[in-house]
Amino acid sequence: LSRWPQATVLHQPQRQGKTAALNRGMKFVKTPLVIFTDANTHLNREALREIVHAFANPKVGCVAGEKRIAVQSKDNAASGGEGIYWKYESTLKALDSRLYSAVGAAGELFAVRRELFEDMRTDTLLDDFILSLRIAMHGYTIAYCATAYATESGSADMQEEEKRKV
């Protein structure tokens, strides 16, 4: 951390979950836009620039990036199926966004206007979806930005995928 003196570490000794950490951390944010990613994702070089550009429209309250699955092997059914699912999901988000607004954002990569963030219950599941949907309920759109993408490895096998989801 000494390489980034401008970084602020918000240590919390008790484990309270991701949603509690988001609620707490947002109280320290000073910028007008907040970009969220998962720790296990790799962003494309232009992702941040592209996602911020989408906020030029004042009606946009949230921008959803694209999730991509890196398939390591063609015979890996788990990651292959996951990759197909996310391509389908991305197509739906792109079409919804062109029509009016995407429905929800995936936690791998999305951004919100800071003033639209509302604390969530700490037992919230799918915090990314709930946060983006609340913003849409306030009359803002969720833009989909395929040129801002996050890539993550797929599951090694079906057992690993089941552990992640259950």
Give residue ranges: language-model regions.
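Short acidic donor-binding/metal-coordinating loop in glycosyltransferase active sites
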Residues: 14, 25, 31, 39-41, ...
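Active-site phosphate/pyrophosphate-handling residues
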Residues: 20, 40, 46, 91, ...
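Catalytic donor/gating beta->alpha subdomain of glycosyltransferases that bind UDP-sugars
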Residues: 55-89, 122-166
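Glycine/small-residue-rich pyrophosphate-binding loop that anchors the diphosphate of NDP-sugar donors
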Residues: 25, 84, 100-109, 114, ...
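Conserved donor nucleotide-binding strand/loop of the catalytic core
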Residues: 1-28, 66, 79-82, 86, ...
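Short aromatic/hydrophobic "clamp" motif used to bind/position activated sugar donors
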Residues: 34
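Acidic donor-binding/catalytic loop of UDP-sugar-dependent glycosyltransferases
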Residues: 37-54
